[in-house]
Amino acid sequence: MSTARFIKCVTVGDGAVGKTCMLISYTSNTFPTDYVPTVFDNFSANVVVDGSTVNLGLWDTAGQEDYNRLRPLSYRGADVFLLAFSLLSRASYENISKKWIPELRHYAPTVPIVLVGTKLDLREDRQYLIDHPGATPITTAQGEELKKAIGAAVYLECSSKTQQNVKAVFDAAIKVVLQPPKPKKKRKKTRPCVFL
């Protein structure tokens, strides 16, 4: 019997976008009700995806600026990044391009990225939107647009509270590592035939 392949998956994104909740929801099927800013936490689980067993190492990072110098230490050896933003925070969405992509490409230029929009359950929650008049929900189309702009392998939206698509996020991360997307072939420019 062969040993399971180890995959290091690192969550990255602004503080309070739901990175830790997503990890807890995935690993324990529970939703934490209190917000506790993360320093660094690691989880490990054996997971079967498409018949392959992998040992998925989950690394949580703190998005707060206080950790800008520490956070990159967790990037070493990463196989895939889960780059998260809140579907209810325009600032966290904009920081994907402004802050996170430059940081990830500086420290880990070739590691694939799964872009994740979190808090999906709140995007259509009328009461939440009434209580938070400044919230401008990010649409699925905007998420797909950002995926293309940053060169992410996949874009998914999830809710840690309802667990909608949470497993799909981690399955996608594993698949990106096990079956990397084939690079697109550049078509050669052909000259038209000219007969004399």
From Swiss-Prot:
The keyword tRNA-binding does not apply. Keywords: Cytoplasm, GTP-binding, Lipoprotein, Membrane, Methylation, Nucleotide-binding, Prenylation. It is found in: Cytoplasm; Membrane. A motif (Effector region) lies at residues 35-43. It is a peripheral membrane protein. A lipid is attached at residue 193 (S-geranylgeranyl cysteine). Its main location: cytoplasm. CDD domains: Rop_like. Disulfide bonds: none annotated. The modification Cysteine methyl ester is found at residue 193. It comes from the Eukaryota. GO terms for biological process: small GTPase-mediated signal transduction. GTP binds at residues 13-20, 60-64, 118-121. Gene3D superfamilies: P-loop containing nucleotide triphosphate hydrolases. Belongs to the small GTPase superfamily. Rho family. This is Rac-like GTP-binding protein RAC2. It comes from Lotus japonicus (Lotus corniculatus var. japonicus). The gene is RAC2.
